[in-house]
Curated annotation (Swiss-Prot):
Pfam families: HGTP_anticodon, tRNA-synt_His. This is Histidine--tRNA ligase. Belongs to the class-II aminoacyl-tRNA synthetase family. The gene is hisS. GO terms for cellular component: cytoplasm. GO terms for biological process: histidyl-tRNA aminoacylation. PANTHER family: HISTIDINE--TRNA LIGASE, MITOCHONDRIAL-RELATED, HISTIDYL-TRNA SYNTHETASE. It comes from Pseudomonas savastanoi pv. phaseolicola (strain 1448A / Race 6) (Pseudomonas syringae pv. phaseolicola (strain 1448A / Race 6)). It catalyses: tRNA(His) + L-histidine + ATP = L-histidyl-tRNA(His) + AMP + diphosphate + H(+).
């Protein structure tokens, strides 16, 4: 196949064998968010480039290296969104839904785009579920976001595979004082830093803290600690968050090097990480961004949120074997009909069953075929039972119900009793 007819590198098709697990994950998250009182918002995937320069920061890796940016026919510079927070802030500002101190608890889902080197768990088109809360400034809402994700991990069966890391970045003023101290410390040891971190020291010094370079990590052991520069307000806020997590029984680790890769964060930052996915260990990350709305032209409005990577969490579910059996199986019952009269009867019968058992996944054979070929397709479908309707069954107004998994003999069930029978052996287990 020519290159022009293939998917772009790092932008993957999600095939029918994969989508049931995606839908299971997305459905679980959306139900949880509904239960906590969050409302969905949907934003465009393309925004003016200036939005991300103002929000993320012009000297971040995302803006400098990773954004998909192009000029449209009007000469406007547009960008495929690399993350969701900036677009969500733009939307609430544009529509005035946070004015007058209105509290908004929002969530969104969709693709994001970054021109990174594709590898396991990291793609150029990737999908996120994001949550943003506006006009609540206490540690209680920070705690709610973390408690909510903790509940999600329990629902998915992955709590033992993830770890919560916390830090506080303080206010912008406290961060500026710390940045000056860090720059002074590292500048005196410039020859011990790798080339990439020498560049970061000039453009975004705090990013040096999350380096993976061993020699730079060794230098940072004796570097000034951000916690020593925190303002009193941030310190009290952070203590309040930790007290609530302790009360909820959620274990956490304080990571003083956790700074996040976006300029707009302040006070609380957190990440859920796993050691099950190799280098791409962060599955959910977020924090507080109290100055972002004002930075983007709005009135002072507090904000806090997080985003979780769907690809990584789906991969984690697969790695841990946490794929529910009913998700792996896409069909419950497969009907085989032999002869035109049986096909006509099957159509009416199966539609009646669908009315009575709307959650039953019932597939009817299409394309006719011999008994052997239809039965082979029934087995390949993964269905628990095959329904058999031929001339004999048609004459007796019964249908054969044959187990395809495990033990059990075929039973002939009267048409008017079929729904009740399937409800007892399939729907109710």
């Amino acid at each position: 196949m020519s290159k022009s007819l293939q998917a772009i590198r790092g932008m993957n098709d999600i095939l029918p064998e994969q989508t049931p697990l995606w839908r299971h994950f997305e459905g679980t998250v959306s139900r949880l968010l509904d239960n906590y009182g969050y409302r969905q918002i949907r934003m465009p995937i393309v925004e003016f480039t200036e939005l991300f320069k103002r929000s993320i920061g012009e000297v971040t890796d995302i803006v400098e290296k990773e954004m998909y940016t192009f000029a449209d026919r009007n000469g406007d510079s547009l960008t495929l969104r690399p993350e969701g927070t900036a677009a969500c802030v733009r939307a609430v500002l544009e529509h005035g839904i946070t004015g007058g101190g209105q509290v908004q608890k929002l969530w969104y889902i969709g693709p994001m785009f970054r021109h990174e080197r594709p590898q396991k768990g990291r793609y150029r088109q990737f999908h996120q579920i994001g949550v943003e809360v506006f006009n609540l400034d206490g540690p209680d809402i920070d705690a709610e976001l973390i408690v909510m994700t903790w509940r999600l991990w329990g629902m998915l069966g992955i709590r033992n595979a993830v770890k919560l890391e916390l830090n506080s970045l303080g206010t912008s003023e406290a961060r500026a004082r710390y940045r000056d101290a860090l720059v002074e410390f590292l500048s005196a040891r410039l020859d011990q830093l790798d080339e990439d971190n020498q560049r970061r020291l000039k453009t975004n010094p705090l990013r040096v803290l999350d380096t993976k370079h061993p020699e730079t990590q060794a230098v940072l052991v004796d570097a000034p600690k951000l916690a020593d520069y925190l303002d009193d307000e941030s310190r009290v806020h952070f203590e309040g968050l930790k007290a609530r997590l302790d009360a909820a029984g959620i274990p956490y680790v304080i990571n003083p090097k956790l700074v996040r890769g976006l300029d707009y964060y302040s006070k609380t930052v957190f990440e859920w990480v796993t050691d099950q996915l190799g280098a791409q260990g962060t599955v959910c990350a977020g924090g507080r961004y109290d100055g972002l709305v004002e930075q983007m032209g709005g009135k002072p409005t507090t904000g806090v949120g997080f985003a979780m990577g769907i690809e990584r969490l789906v991969l984690l579910l697969e790695t841990l074997g946490q794929v529910p059996e009913e998700i792996a199986r896409q069909v419950d019952v497969y009907l085989c009909a032999f002869g035109e009269a049986a096909e006509l009867a099957a159509l009416a019968l199966t539609e009646k069953v669908r009315d009575q058992l709307p959650s039953l996944r019932l597939q009817v054979n299409a394309g006719a075929g011999s008994f052997k070929s239809q039965f082979k397709k029934a087995d390949k479908s993964g269905a628990l039972y095959a329904l058999i309707l031929g001339e004999e069954e048609l004459a007796a107004k019964v249908i054969g119900v044959k187990p395809l998994r495990g033990q059990g003999e075929q039973q002939n069930i009267a048409w008017d009793a079929l729904s009740e029978h399937l409800a007892s052996c399939v729907v109710q287990g």
